[in-house]
Design a protein with these regions (language model features):
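Short, surface-exposed ligand-recognition loops at beta-strand->loop->(often short) alpha-helix junctions
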Residues: 457-465
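Long, low-complexity, intrinsically disordered segments
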Residues: 572-609
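Alpha-helical transmembrane segments and immediately membrane-proximal extracytoplasmic
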Residues: 1-445, 461
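Short, solvent-exposed beta-strand edge segments and adjacent coil->beta transition regions
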Residues: 452-456, 508-510
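Long, charged amphipathic helices and adjacent flexible linkers at domain junctions
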Residues: 433-452, 536-545, 549
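A generic structured-segment signal
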Residues: 24-25, 472-475, 595-596
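Cytosolic Rossmann-like ligand/nucleotide-binding regulatory domains
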Residues: 466-530, 536, 540-545, 552-558
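Low-complexity, charge- and small-residue-enriched intrinsically disordered regions
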Residues: 277, 432, 550-571, 576, ...
């Protein structure tokens, strides 16, 4: 009977503290993301199509070409003004979203939503090689944070939910942008967090579920298909032609390594060597360059959806595909590093489709049946994207969902993706957005240096982490649980480790945290959101040891919210007394490794100063 009551109590608590918040937050952010991203995607598609028509009109009326370039300069200057006014627009939208999901940054969500949409529309109008999918993910993640911020009014512990809700919003944005719900969930787990946990999975799935319902409902009302690409039934490739897969895998792996390297080097060149060139001038240059390309080769501009569909429909000769490949490859390396706003998912897929079109035509010339052409194009798209993003599962599932076609039963695609992935892994090529994310993270703390700190926190009853496993928690960025101190049945303190992260967190346990961060106070504050019971008012004091780079968290004097200000004054007096006692203590003999590392960091910092 007691056991049944305990199980019933656990289930009620689980529903109240986990399932209900996931459904509520996921439902709100999913519905809002579905509405906003669907509208954004529709506007982006309209502007891109109109941009192509504008370029075609100027080609037929060359007398007015100066007006075209004047208009492009105006668009570029407006984009530069927004770039300067809104910091969230200075970094790639995917890198921004992944940074928010990992806890490396927060949005000012009002200006981010407005700025992302407006600045992206300027890029699409100018014909830049940007897609709508990257900004859609940023919009979704921003809406997730906004939902969480409003949740402060209804859920006391909502700061602890922030990264989960941001993840759910990003997954919803991805799902609506591509019409690929499963890929949206996979993307956040494989690419953003690089981990799988039940809470992350449920949060992402909840948001994606509601966003997909909204998106498909709107699509049904206006008669618009949710599928990204429109193709017929694909032909399964026989085993005797699997030699083509080896060529595709090697070609995509080498090309992805080259692309990621050139993209990263170009970004370094802009930030380090060309830093004196103002951002507005770089943006004006890329708009004008796109204008020249649009007048000469209008099929090569835009996000790339038209190009992919045209390649699948055999609309281009191999000569056109070859020229388009070099033009798009160069533009895609330069454009995102200029400071203009837009996404890279579809442009990257377009590069893969162009390579697939060229290889497909080459294989056909070598005797392969033309019925396998579309299959080769889709396999190459998947492989190139999986290699550049370092997200093979997401790439495979994405192409299947975009086409609504379960081609080649995953086997042929899995082979090529594996080959390409092994190549970029062997060459130690960073994922496409990783470098941009880390650079923006460092710039946010310019003048500071990351140091190692160690502090302890006590888990309170009713806190966010209580009853959950260590691996299920999104701990503050740069923080690792070193060991756990708990009290056994006999009342003795036991010091243990939990490398697998399977241990269930209980109230009263003390967790030692090792943090490699720029701002130790911020790390402590975020840890408090997780381990603190918001039903009680607590005053937190952070004390720094003399000659020690680490910090120790001292939490004192829990007081009820209804206690008077006089009681709060007593709390302050208790802190003053504690500080005097603490500062006279000697440094403990443990933490030698951390103490030495921090000492070296501080010495380097003082030498630099």
């Amino acid at each position: 009977m007691t056991k049944n009551k305990s199980s019933e109590k656990f289930m009620i608590g689980y529903i109240r503290t986990t399932l209900l918040p996931i459904l509520v937050f996921g439902g709100v952010s999913g519905v809002l993301s579905g509405l906003v991203v669907w509208g954004f995607k529709w506007c982006a598609s309209y502007l891109e199509n109109e941009s192509v028509q504008i370029y075609k009109w100027f080609r037929l009326n060359p007398t007015f070409i100066p007006l075209l370039f004047a208009g492009l300069i105006v668009l570029a200057l407006l984009s530069a003004i927004m770039n300067k006014a809104i910091p969230e627009l200075r970094t790639n939208s995917i890198a921004n979203a992944e940074g928010a999901m990992r806890g490396m940054k927060r949005y000012n969500w009002v200006r981010t939503i407005f700025g992302t949409m407006a600045s992206s529309f300027l890029s699409y109008t100018g014909g830049l090689t940007f897609g709508a999918e990257g900004p859609s993910i940023q919009l979704g993640s921003t809406i997730g944070q906004a939902t969480n911020d409003f949740g402060h009014f209804i859920e006391k512990g909502s700061p602890a939910w922030e990264r989960y809700n941001v993840t759910g919003g990003a997954a919803a944005g991805f799902a609506v942008a591509f019409g690929a719900p499963l890929s949206g969930i996979l993307y956040t787990l494989e690419e953003a967090h690089k981990r799988l946990s039940p809470m992350l999975l449920m949060t992402a799935a909840s948001s994606v579920f509601f966003a997909t319902i909204v998106s498909q409902s709107i699509g049904d009302l206006v008669g618009q298909s949710d599928y990204f690409l429109q193709i017929g039934t694909l032909t399964l490739m026989p085993y005797k032609f699997y030699w083509t897969l080896l060529i595709i895998g090697i070609a995509c792996g080498c090309l992805a390594a080259l692309f990621n390297t050139l993209f990263a080097k170009t970004g370094e060149l802009v930030r380090e060597k060309l830093v004196k060139i103002p951002t507005w001038l770089r943006i004006v240059f890329i708009f004008l360059l796109t204008g020249v390309v649009g007048l000469v080769f209008v099929d090569a501009i835009g996000g790339g959806h038209r190009i992919i569909q045209g390649i699948l429909n055999l609309d281009f000769t191999w000569q056109v595909l070859l020229v388009m490949f070099f033009v798009r490859f160069a533009l895609l390396i330069i454009t995102p590093n200029s400071g203009a706003m837009g996404g890279m998912f579809v442009p990257v897929l377009t590069i893969g489709a162009l390579v697939g079109g060229l290889l497909g035509k080459a294989f056909i010339a070598m005797g392969l049946s033309s019925e396998f052409y579309q299959t080769i194009v889709l396999i190459t798209m998947t492989t190139f994207m999986g290699a550049t993003m370092r997200a093979p599962l997401t790439a495979i599932v994405l192409v299947v969902e975009m086409t609504n076609n379960y081609f080649s039963s995953f086997l042929s695609t899995g082979i090529t993706v594996m080959i390409a992935y092994l190549i970029v892994e062997a060459l130690r090529i960073e994922p496409l957005y990783e470098k941009a994310l880390m650079d923006s993270f460092k710039n946010a703390y310019k003048g500071k240096h990351r140091k190692v700190y160690e502090f302890s926190v006590v888990v309170e009853k009713g806190s966010f982490v209580e009853g959950r496993s260590v691996k299920d928690i999104l701990w503050p960025y740069g923080c690792t649980i070193v060991n756990v101190i708990k009290v056994d049945d006999e009342g003795n303190k036991v010091d243990t480790t939990d490398k697998a992260g399977d241990r269930v967190i209980r109230a009263g346990q003390t967790y030692t945290v090792k943090a490699f961060v720029y701002d130790e106070l911020k790390a402590i504050e975020e840890m408090e959101y997780l381990t603190k019971n918001y039903s009680v008012r607590e005053t937190t004091e952070l004390l720094k040891r003399k000659g020690f780079g680490g910090i120790l968290l001292r939490r004192k004097a829990k007081t009820n919210k209804k206690e008077s200000d006089g009681a709060n004054g007593a709390v302050d007096s208790a802190f003053d007394a504690e500080r005097k006692n603490f500062e006279t203590q000697e440094m403990p003999a443990d933490n030698k490794e951390i103490r030495e590392q921090v000492g070296n960091d501080e010495k380097v910092d003082s030498d630099k100063q």
